[in-house]
Amino acid sequence: MSLIRRGNAFDPFSLDLWDPVDGFPFGSGGSSSSSGSLFPRANSDAAAFAGARIDWKETPEVHVFKADVPGLKKEEVKVEVDDGNILQISGERSREQEEKSDKWHRVERSSGKFLRRFRLPENTKPEQIKASMENGVLTVTVPKEEPKKPDVKSIQISG
């Protein structure tokens, strides 16, 4: 059993899902068994979906999401808001067209999809979300609403 993930740690499309019982004899979904499993090994497409690494930080003014998407063009990445408060970041890298005359010696770059969803806090302005991409890093900025100041009402004391 290994705690180290298989695949290239710098490629969000190539990571396998870690199986905590991989290698045990009682039917893990890992390489040691192909039968039913408590934790079935994901196929490469499912692993690609889970593999996208995204950081989320909050500042006093905004929420910032940063995703490593090396090799993707901005046309291959989607940023959407679903139901007003679910931020969805997805992308797809297609396979390179192969010519019959091509002879491949090594294929390390993978193709696949990823999809990540985040529930935005109530104090955000989803209609003002901005996204940019530079050097293989997608940055999504979600502005926050200014905190509401409590209404203070003076009560006149009688008597």
From Swiss-Prot:
Record GO cellular component, one term: cytoplasm
Subcellular location per the Swiss-Prot or TrEMBL entry: Cytoplasm
UniProt KW keywords: Cytoplasm, Stress response
Residue span, sHSP domain: 45-159
GO terms, biological process: protein complex oligomerization; protein folding; response to arsenic-containing substance; response to cadmium ion; response to copper ion; response to ethanol; response to heat; response to hydrogen peroxide
Principal location: cytoplasm
Induction behaviour: By heat shock, arsenic, azetidine-2-carboxylate, cadmium, copper, ethanol and hydrogen peroxide.
Record keyword Cytoplasm present: yes
MF GO annotations: unfolded protein binding
Domain of life: Eukaryota
A Pfam family: HSP20
Keyword Repeat: no
Family: Belongs to the small heat shock protein (HSP20) family.
Quaternary organization: May form oligomeric structures.
Protein name in UniProt: 17.7 kDa class I heat shock protein
Lineage: Eukaryota, Viridiplantae, Streptophyta, Embryophyta, Tracheophyta
